């Protein structure tokens, strides 16, 4: 029973993604975000670690743990149990949302190593007494999104063996509560993501955490002036300060001696080219994120000396062509994000030698067919983002040799149906975005040989019921968006057998009726469904009863009422988290 004790503890702090709001009839990007952020259901948890194939069944240990959890009210203490067993029972109660303040008491003095209560409801200071009772056995604690305050934090003072602590979104913890951290010198991972209590003054406590390897301060907007307290944390390998909006060049100079840094996240900070110049000595840096910072191509001179760099994000910066020759020195780059900059075809000349690139984002840049020819030698490319560029059908011929390409975004480009023949030759493609009014049934028909597609975005394409026949060829589709307004119930018949679908967006097809809901009633893997702006009514909701995995349902601007949607969730689809109308 050494599984819990022996698990690896050197994992990176999860940096997550920024929350985004979506317009009413938005593309399914909002649904994709939702899929990543949804909590697991009880059914998800019950399958964890259990075989799902024929003849497989839970292990004896799993059965014992499940039975103890079921009868948890019968027990007063687990101190006599082996630590691994107590740990498994605790984890199971948390995963199934069955842990209460009362049942938590049974784990007092059980020498648990991991207390993961992140986003768990009801966690407060009173719970921390049991957490702290694990004393020096305690190695990791997660109380993110809790009501724990300074008092609760102070109770952890004697748990000196803690290596990992996550207090994300803990608004009740002030700079006073941070003071107790100074004694936790064994901490290697610390996360206070979007916590208002983290201030420049409060960061004094970090100065003693000399063993820190991972530090996440994302969204802590009051830390300007506090980075001086990090200057001696020379073991730091990852530092996340995304959306710390007031971090300036004067702060970055205190990072110059952190030469072991491998991952530095600085998006949306007040950093200029001067601030980037302080990073010159970080020879081990592999990931650098400067998205949304007021830097120019002049910063590339300093960045070009970061020989270990494999990922560089300059999205939404002020990059022009001048200075882009410095990209040529970044030979190890695998990921380069230049979206929403002012670069033109002239910049792409300097990318052609970056032969290790696997992902390239040129979204909304001023590039066209002439520049695309410089990408033809990047044969390791797996993802290419060309949305909102002037790339047309002629430019696609230069991509024919990119046999490893798995994802391409051609939304809002000048590409037409003729170009689809060239795309169809890229047999490794899994994801294709053709949100483009110039794409019609003819172009879709040219793609039917791409039977391995898992994601197909035809949001604004002019696909009719005739073209919808092509959907039968894409048996592996997990995500489909077809919202051009020309699909009727007849076209949906070609979707009803795509059993792998988890996301389906049919919004803005105004002629869809309740028959559509009947046709897709067998797509039981669906997690997100959007049939907004259609003729669907309350009467059609009965067809959704078997879609038990559904978490998001959007039926805005239909004949469905909010009251009926609420009834649907209460009586039929209890796992629904997001629904419209509401």
Indicate residue ranges for each PLM-predicted region.
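Short, solvent-exposed loop/turn at the beta-strand->alpha-helix junction
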Residues: 95-101, 121-126, 146-153, 171-176, ...
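Long, low-complexity, Ser/Thr- and acidic/proline-rich intrinsically disordered regions
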Residues: 1-11, 18, 23, 295, ...
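Alpha-solenoid helical-repeat scaffolds
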Residues: 95-209, 213-219, 228-232, 239
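Cullin-RING E3 adaptor/co-adaptor recruitment helices
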Residues: 2-140
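Leucine-rich repeat domain C-terminal region
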Residues: 5-50, 524-534, 547-582
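Ankyrin-repeat and related helical/solenoid repeat scaffolds used for protein-protein interactions
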Residues: 452, 459, 476, 483, ...
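Conserved hydrophobic beta-strand positions in leucine-rich repeat
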Residues: 113-118, 139-143, 163-168, 187-193, ...
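Leucine-rich repeat
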Residues: 134-135, 158-160, 181-187, 206-210, ...
